[in-house]
Amino acid sequence: MSLNVVILAAGKGTRMRSSLPKVLHPVANKPMVSHVIETARKVGAEQLHLVYGHGAELLKERIQASDLNWVLQAQQLGTGHAVAQAIPFWQDEDDVLVLYGDTPLIQPETLQRLLAAKASDGMALLTVVLDNPTGYGRIVRSNGQVVGIVEQKDANAEQLAIREVNTGVLVANGGQLRSWLSRLDNKNAQGEFYLTDVIAMAHADNCPIAAVHPDDAMEVEGANNRVQLAQLERSYQKMQAERLMIAGATLIDPARFDLRGTLEIGEEVVIDVNVIIEGKVVLGNHVRIGAGSVLKDCVIGDHSEVKPYSVIEGAQIADQCSVGPFTRLRPGTVLEQDAHVGNFVEMKKARLGVGSKCGHLTYLGDAEVGAKVNIGAGTITCNYDGVNKFQTIIEDDVFVGSDTQLVAPVRIGKGATLGAGSTITKDVAENELVITRVPQRHIQNWARPVKKK
């Protein structure tokens, strides 16, 4: 026996008013269906079947996974018809879990409880109680037992008053589900083959039906339009913010924090407002992230601070470093311990050594900077000739004066001093002072031009 997961992703999503298939619309910068696929893997899916229809080429382009079995639903004739397309791919003794590509917030823990609630010869449903159940299929019970589901358009007044609703998520035995699906008809207001009709069949066959509720109703929220998509995004971010705060992080305003990847935190991490986390980010102990900063695929060491409005991507920042405000660190940047990078500094494929400082208005690209180096304001490494990139090497204890250009390839020896306003085109030896600026001239009795009226 194995667990087969069938993910329904064939809908066009007309109300999105988009050429993009609905399940490819992003939540936290990732397609909704990708969230569902990842959750299915976490609960131990041995076979993953993705039922697709509209936008097949785009789906296969965006969702590239070797463990997916792509199942075509050529005509969208309802959820029951969609699941039935996967019948040839599961065995009678398998368990079949049905999920939906537009409900990205469902949690692995909820699905584990659902799987555990299913009797060996039974079925388990995920249901939720809503204050406003309009639009959802109602759970019909008799003497406390689930006996069926009635869709909104087919419900009578008594059934419309029911607040327990169907989420569509269920798990059943493969053989039983095969039998029930084969008996579906489309004699209903929508003219579709409803997956929900198998519940009444299961009851008629004396199949035990368990019902499980998610911890939070937001787990089963879907998106049919862009308003609901935005609501999903906020619900997702609320879940992530709460998880981080429970783990010990301080979020100055949880409602103004976006996690669009994964974040690993140490102790006493403080994150100010409007911070965006993308990719895989690791923050050490006692790290502070300033307002409006964007972090992507980076590691920040203990007791380091990123000041407001800094953008850090693909960088490694050691312990006790200071970055920003208004700093951009691009891929390949490494800051060693106690390094400081200040406002309006950009670094790319550059290393700043232990205790070195680069405080203002500087570009360091393709550069190796040693320990205890001072980089003056306005320094530029000229690393590109229009075709090729070249490296600048600055050894330990160098002092670089303001407004200096280093034309790569060039090496500055240990302890050298570069005078402000210099353009360095040749290597500099250890402990040398180099000044290349034009000598200052004094012109007496100079009269500035006067505009003619």
Curated annotation (Swiss-Prot):
Pfam families: Hexapep (PF00132), NTP_transf_3 (PF12804). Mg(2+) binds at D102, N224. Its cofactor is Mg(2+). This is Bifunctional protein GlmU. Disulfide bonds: none annotated. Its main location: cytoplasm. It comes from the Bacteria. The keyword Acyltransferase applies. Its EC number is 2.7.7.23, 2.3.1.157. It comes from Aeromonas hydrophila subsp. hydrophila (strain ATCC 7966 / DSM 30187 / BCRC 13018 / CCUG 14551 / JCM 1027 / KCTC 2358 / NCIMB 9240 / NCTC 8049). It is an enzyme of class 2 (transferase).
